[in-house]
């Protein structure tokens, strides 16, 4: 009985600790995945957006617009959303910390002109 009790405690701690780790965005290669909303290949990494659910499911999008529409259609509350820094596409920014602008000076994959930046200063050359 004592051994079974300790096995249960060990199993519970393992599950809890595995779920407490920091979740980070995945690096992709161009064309490796398709957008989970519109099914276009993700080829322009400046617009790559990722989200993860509270259950650990990860979704990839070719544009911020697709992620927003996906969330609204599914009526979901993601655990985390990351957007690519337009100026440095291998860098992800948590969406809540990103400066997102809409401009006709940027051609995003879905045509919405949305792009994410790390700071307000970075957006100045792209403002209408």
Predicted regions and their residues:
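Hydrophobic helical h-region of N-terminal Sec-dependent signal peptides
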Residues: 11-14
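Thiol/selenol-based redox catalytic cores and closely related redox-interacting motifs
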Residues: 80-128
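Short metal-coordination and nucleic-acid-contact micro-motifs, chiefly zinc-binding Cys/His arrays
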Residues: 31
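C-terminal motif of bacterial Sec signal peptides marking the signal peptidase cleavage site
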Residues: 17-19
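Bacterial N-terminal signal peptides that target proteins for export
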Residues: 1-9
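Post-signal-peptide N-terminal segment of Sec-exported extracytoplasmic proteins
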Residues: 36-75
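Bacterial signal peptide processing site
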Residues: 21-23
